[in-house]
């Protein structure tokens, strides 16, 4: 991120510089008043400086190229860590040895898989007058049985037919509507080298029938074999192919009786093939060595891969770093491992991990070869002290520790063991002798030798213990001094950055950078390198102008060009070949002044603010303040990047989870496939129904086409009506109108219901609304109600009258139905004609009214 931000800063600075200085090109007189001598940094020095920067060698600041720097607030932000905690190793036991560090392998397990399937394409072709057309096309794929995959993997051949059972009926699809035969597989060109495909039919069979205006169904069967890579990550519960297929099982599943690997696929779809052979296409027909292969039938395709075992094929740990000068310190219940080559320490529990080599056989060769190479480097001074030890850190690292002992200590211990052995031998021999032999002359010599051996033993033991304690003390002091020195250096850099942040950061980076303190942090940005051949210093350092005769530049003015720019720009030469962007660094002119300015490989001498001569930089003596310490130089310390965010946090930070998306997509695709299979078993598959109906209509010829067109027209009409209603409802105004009508209907129903309730409660008031007025004015109008007997007579008369009218109405309806016929239709037609002429039918009257006319 730092390099990216600095690059962006450099481009922004370059753009700002072009906008600022494009309007101030130098005049011709200023161009002529430049120093003609060579004054630029040579290409060889620039190239050497860049190579040194790439190798981590800090170059002389005077060899930096001419450049324009600007401390921008948008640069990379840094701060110095001023608080460190050094380990307290006092009175601790220190051991030196070889440290091997293994990190957890996050690279997925990659293996080869093969995908087999047969793709069936059924097309309905219309033979038109002017052109043919594909009116319908259905594509589906099916898996391939193992007996046929053997032919595909060995001789690259397959059968061009497919048998499918639908609703208890066997359907046979044959390529080009021909007969079943063996066809060859041919390679297919692809974009990726990791995916290779072979197929048998590259073209779709779409030839129309011989009947003009007729429909014909064509079938294409294509055998396809895809060889690609699959990836799996721990805990190996699924793997994904490069073409997007997901298998919910471990790639190390083997169907063993004590199987521990996960398998989420149905057992009926899994097959283990023994002595299976896969041949490369170039060597088809040969007989390679057989192997065990796993097959899974996904209904739409078959997938296979070679059986592998986890502890052999996949290694959980990957070698990261090795150190032959590490220190192990015991701190109570934990162990601290420190190496001078990296700025980090590792701590683990003081218990070893026993099951590492048993579960991960792949580590044996790596550990053995790495230990052998590291021991060869320290073989002259150290020797192994015991066997290798294995520890696991809390961060998930595996540490392999091989204790070492110095050769001097080993020689001293060998001498001590030899003396002890000789002393024990002498003691044993003395006890077996008789008392008479103990009084012999030689017994005095043996006693003296035994005493001398005891003294020698104590001296050797003291020397051994003292040397061991001193070595431990030296290792302890080195460990603490190294930590304190790093802390002091960090504090020193922090304080120096307050004085000149650009020099400090350039020294740390080893290349020219621009730095500026913005509060408590430092903003660092790249410098823009100008065209080295265009940099020229002016002869005079006096400020031009009549009113500025007493002013002179404190730094010599310089003209330069940017790379890929033809305009000349003016500035002032700064320190270490830096070009200042302004010409405001002026001072009052003094008499008899001398100035020396370094630019590139030359030193420019100015007398009275006028250039006098140019001399090489080497002619000026240097003040050597470097004190050489005649010791072996400390090895370089490379700062390692500390992982701020864990792998899980990085995975969760993205908005797209590609693995989950693919798994869910394939999962629901398989669910739809299962649903389609169920529908096929129930003989209600829509595609099969449409295909069967289309075949029936084709067999009927013209009649079938007429029926098909009529059915299509009716279906289209109803579809248009339904679609129109749905679209009308979807429209905002239509939806509001519909809701308004529904509300009106609901209100009408409520009002009618209330009216019916009122009629049932008080029918007389509903029929005669003036009954209340009559009741209130009964005394004034002197109206007396009839008796209940008279009321019953009136109600009975009304009932009888209504009962007598019902048979007559039924007879009129029956007579009307009997008279309805051709004559009735004729009378109706005549009535229509009469109405057009202006005639109207007469109104009927009751019989008693007609008879009453005189």
From Swiss-Prot:
Gene3D superfamilies: 1.20.5.1890, 2.30.29.100, 2.30.30.1230, 6.10.250.3280. Residues 802-813 have a biased composition (Basic and acidic residues). InterPro entries: Glycoprot_B_PH1 (IPR035377), Glycoprot_B_PH2 (IPR035381), Glycoprot_B_PH2_sf (IPR038631), Glycoprotein_B_ecto_C (IPR055341), Herpes_Glycoprot_B (IPR000234). Disulfide bonds join 69-527, 86-483, 158-223, 315-362, 552-589. Residues 125-131, 209-217 are annotated as: Involved in fusion and/or binding to host membrane. One of its GO terms (cellular component) is host cell endosome membrane. One of its GO terms (biological process) is symbiont entry into host cell. The chain crosses the membrane at residues 733-753. A proteolytic cleavage by host furin generates two subunits that remain linked by disulfide bonds. Residues 422-443, 802-829 are annotated as: Disordered. Envelope glycoprotein that forms spikes at the surface of virion envelope. Essential for the initial attachment to heparan sulfate moieties of the host cell surface proteoglycans. Involved in fusion of viral and cellular membranes leading to virus entry into the host cell. Following initial binding to its host receptors, membrane fusion is mediated by the fusion machinery composed at least of gB and the heterodimer gH/gL. May be involved in the fusion between the virion envelope and the outer nuclear membrane during virion egress. This is Envelope glycoprotein B. The gene is gB.
